[in-house]
């Protein structure tokens, strides 16, 4: 009976907190990325700006004899 209690205590007091603390491990990486200026909102603004500049008419309506009309 005491060994079962010891196993339960080991699981809930040692192993369970170790497993749950690893889930928060990515927070420091996110903080460093923000300090380097890799903000996601800035990346989204840049990607929208690039997409507006590109001529997507060619991709939306390919020429009749192009490869993409066969697909």
From Swiss-Prot:
Residue numbers of D-phenylalanine PTMs: 67
Domain of life according to the entry: Eukaryota
Residue ranges listed under propeptide: 22-54, 70-71
Record field: compositional bias (Basic and acidic residues): 28-39
Pfam (any one): Conotoxin
PTM-bearing positions, type 4-hydroxyproline: 64
Subcellular location per the Swiss-Prot or TrEMBL entry: Secreted
Single GO molecular function: ion channel inhibitor activity
Modified how: The D-Phe is essential to the structural conformation. Since conomarphin is a cysteine-free peptide, hydroxyproline plays a critical role in maintaining a restricted conformation of the peptide.
Tissue expression from the record: Expressed by the venom duct.
Disordered: annotated segments: 27-48
Signal peptide (from-to): 1-21
Keywords: Cleavage on pair of basic residues, D-amino acid, Hydroxylation, Neurotoxin, Secreted, Signal, Toxin
Family: Belongs to the conotoxin M superfamily.
Record's function text: May act as a neurotoxin.
Other noteworthy facts: Negative results: the unmodified synthetic peptide shows no or weak activity on muscular and neuronal nicotinic acetylcholine receptors (alpha-3-beta-2/CHRNA3-CHRNB2, alpha-3-beta-4/CHRNA3-CHRNB4, alpha-4-beta-2/CHRNA4-CHRNB2, and alpha-1-beta-1-delta-epsilon/CHRNA1-CHRNB1-CHRND-CHRNE). The mature peptide does not contain cysteine residues.
Name this protein carries in UniProt: Conomarphin-Mr3
């Amino acid at each position: 009976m005491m060994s079962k209690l010891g196993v339960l205590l080991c699981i809930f007091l040692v192993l369970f907190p170790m497993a749950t603390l690893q889930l928060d491990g990515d927070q420091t990486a996110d903080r460093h990325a923000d300090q380097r200026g890799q903000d996601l909102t800035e990346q989204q603004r840049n990607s929208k700006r690039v997409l507006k500049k590109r001529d997507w008419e060619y991709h939306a309506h390919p020429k009749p004899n192009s490869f993409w009309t066969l697909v």
